[in-house]
């Protein structure tokens, strides 16, 4: 299930575009997630009171969390699959403290793909989308394996 060097290059090329403006990318990813899957909002005490897109756009906490999410994901992607050290604490907190099911990781992955398609159509063609999907699937599978080790059935 690993990615080729060429696929990792496609992933990291488009991720460079994300890093040029992490706050707006992160905010848009979370807003898409929450609008498309309102049940995910319930896992976030800081955001669950936000009902409208305007309220979400105005929330500094939501923007900060978007930065946190995409910064962590960027660190993982840059490891090109050698991300054990990064995955372990992330899985620990998401399994034991936040109780985020793997399904929600799938949903946020979909939101990430949609935001990249929307913001970077010229840099995110079919090959790049396929590579990013594989990279996000690798991340989710490794998170799920850690969840299992921790006894979390998420």
Curated annotation (Swiss-Prot):
Reactions catalysed: Fe(III)-heme b-[protein] + nitric oxide + H2O = Fe(II)-heme b-[protein] + nitrite + 2 H(+); H2O2 + AH2 = A + 2 H2O
Domain Globin residues, every copy: 2-148
GO CC annotations, alphabetized: extracellular exosome; sarcoplasm
Single GO BP term: removal of superoxide radicals
Top-rank taxon: Eukaryota
Primary localization class, coarse: cytoplasm
Residues binding nitrite, per UniProt: 65
GO molecular function: heme binding; metal ion binding; nitrite reductase activity; oxygen binding; oxygen carrier activity; peroxidase activity
Localisation per UniProt entry: Cytoplasm, Sarcoplasm
Record-listed O2 binding positions: 65
Keywords, in A-Z order: Cytoplasm, Heme, Iron, Metal-binding, Muscle protein, Oxidoreductase, Oxygen transport, Phosphoprotein, Transport
Binding-site list for heme b: 94
Matching Gene3D superfamilies: 6.10.140.2100, 6.10.140.2110
Modified residues (Phosphothreonine): 68
EC code(s) of this entry: 1.7.-.-, 1.11.1.-
Modified residues (Phosphoserine): 4
Family statement: Belongs to the globin family.
Cited function: Monomeric heme protein which primary function is to store oxygen and facilitate its diffusion within muscle tissues. Reversibly binds oxygen through a pentacoordinated heme iron and enables its timely and efficient release as needed during periods of heightened demand. Depending on the oxidative conditions of tissues and cells, and in addition to its ability to bind oxygen, it also has a nitrite reductase activity whereby it regulates the production of bioactive nitric oxide.
Description of how the protein assembles with itself and partners: Monomeric.
Protein name in the entry: Myoglobin
Source organism (scientific name): Macaca fascicularis (Crab-eating macaque)
């Amino acid at each position: 299930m690993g990615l080729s060097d060429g696929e990792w290059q496609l992933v990291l090329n488009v991720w460079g575009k994300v890093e040029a403006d992490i706050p707006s990318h992160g905010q848009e990813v979370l807003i898409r997630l929450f609008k498309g899957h309102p049940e995910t909002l319930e896992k976030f005490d800081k955001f669950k009171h936000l009902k409208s897109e305007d309220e979400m756009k105005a929330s500094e906490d939501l923007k900060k969390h978007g930065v946190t999410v995409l910064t962590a994901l960027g660190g993982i992607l840059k490891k090109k699959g050698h991300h054990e050290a990064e995955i372990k604490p992330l899985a620990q907190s998401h399994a034991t403290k936040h109780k985020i099911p793997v399904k929600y990781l799938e949903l946020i992955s979909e939101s990430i793909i949609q935001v990249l398609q929307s913001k970077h159509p010229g840099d995110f063609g079919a090959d790049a989308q396929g590579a990013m999907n594989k990279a996000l699937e690798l991340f989710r599978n490794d998170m799920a394996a850690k969840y299992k080790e921790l006894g979390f059935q998420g």
